[in-house]
Amino acid sequence: MSSKHVAVLLGGFSSERPVSLSSGTACADALEGEGYRVTRVDVGHDVAAVLQELRPDVVFNALHGPFGEDGTIQGILEYLEIPYTHSGVLASALAMDKAQAKHVAKAAGIPVAEAVVMDRRSFGNQHPMKPPYVVKPVREGSSFGVVIVKEDQSHPPQVITSSDWRYGDRIMVERYVAGREFTCGVMGDVALGVTEIIPQGHAFYDYDSKYVKGGSKHVIPAQVSPNIYQKIQTLALKAHQAIGCRGVSRSDFRFDDRGDGEGELIWLEINTQPGMTPTSLVPEMAQHAGLRFGEFLRWMVEDASCLR
């Protein structure tokens, strides 16, 4: 039994709060099962004071979205000198900004789709690029605010310029890549197995596909050629290293194999705070590699540090 005191950060105040509560609760329960002394911290604006009073040995970061995975909480933990899991300040901030992460990935030789970044308020009656394309908020997760513009749409969707839009003014317009969706986790300096994600009843891997029971089917190991499987693993590890991630990350890909030849493999984005319930993608990959959920979390706790 470990004598370490682990504070699990969960909840928070981003749009991904429900996801974080699920991840954090699952992690806290599993870590208690591994013998750690666990305190659950539902994060508010007083989190620094709460942690100063608790003085845990390690913080397990189960937050998602802005504040939790954009370098903000990581900076607080560095200042408090409390070791923590997942990526550090710079990598977290960089990965949270889809446009900047794409620049770094492209510079590292990772294939990406063409994209432009713009202010949503300048989204007029003309398409910013030839459809089909995807509109993504630059700094959101869980597919919040993602809009697919199809080939036959004569005008851009009005929802993007609507006053009801809640996902920030900076958006990225990216060429739509047809085909299959794959994802690959990285644990330290090792790429885990590749999973194919098959949305059930949805056009793409949206919020419901990710979090509603039966919303998607996960196939691991992915049924794809050995060459493409290995290439996905290589690119996931390369993205993890280029962006400077630590601990665990997950990269998402699209693979269009409809034409002649091997097909087009495109890196979409990296997630430095992937979902952490037993049925989430990365824990499934760890299980495929022979690690129980609790063992996987134990590795993350023992890997925790400052100056990440």
UniProtKB/Swiss-Prot annotation:
MF term (GO), any: D-alanine-D-alanine ligase activity
Matching NCBIfam families: D_ala_D_alaTIGR (TIGR01205), PRK01372.1 (NF002378)
Protein known as: D-alanine--D-alanine ligase
Keywords: ATP-binding, Cell shape, Cell wall biogenesis/degradation, Cytoplasm, Ligase, Magnesium, Manganese, Metal-binding, Nucleotide-binding, Peptidoglycan synthesis
Domain of life where this protein originates: Bacteria
Protein's gene: ddl
The keyword Cytoplasm appears for this protein: yes
Residues annotated for Mg(2+) 2 binding in this entry: E269, N271
InterPro entries in alphabetical order: ATP-grasp, ATP_grasp_subdomain_1, D-Ala_lig_Van_CS, D_ala_D_ala, Dala_Dala_lig_C, Dala_Dala_lig_N, PreATP-grasp_dom_sf
Residues spanning the signal sequence: none
Pfam families cross-referenced by the UniProt entry: Dala_Dala_lig_C, Dala_Dala_lig_N
Organism name: Sinorhizobium medicae (strain WSM419)
Subcellular location, principal: cytoplasm
Leading EC class: ligase
EC number: 6.3.2.4
Lineage: Bacteria, Pseudomonadati, Pseudomonadota, Alphaproteobacteria, Hyphomicrobiales
PROSITE patterns for the chain: ATP_GRASP, DALA_DALA_LIGASE_1, DALA_DALA_LIGASE_2
A GO CC term assigned to this protein in UniProt: cytoplasm
Reactions catalysed: 2 D-alanine + ATP = D-alanyl-D-alanine + ADP + phosphate + H(+)
GO BP annotations, alphabetical order: cell wall organization; peptidoglycan biosynthetic process; regulation of cell shape
Domain ATP-grasp: 102-302
Function summary: Cell wall formation.
Pathway where this protein functions: Cell wall biogenesis; peptidoglycan biosynthesis
Subcellular location: Cytoplasm
Coiled coil feature spans: none
Cofactor: Mg(2+); Mn(2+)
Family, per entry: Belongs to the D-alanine--D-alanine ligase family.
Binding site for ATP: 128-183
Binding site for Mg(2+) 1: D252, E269
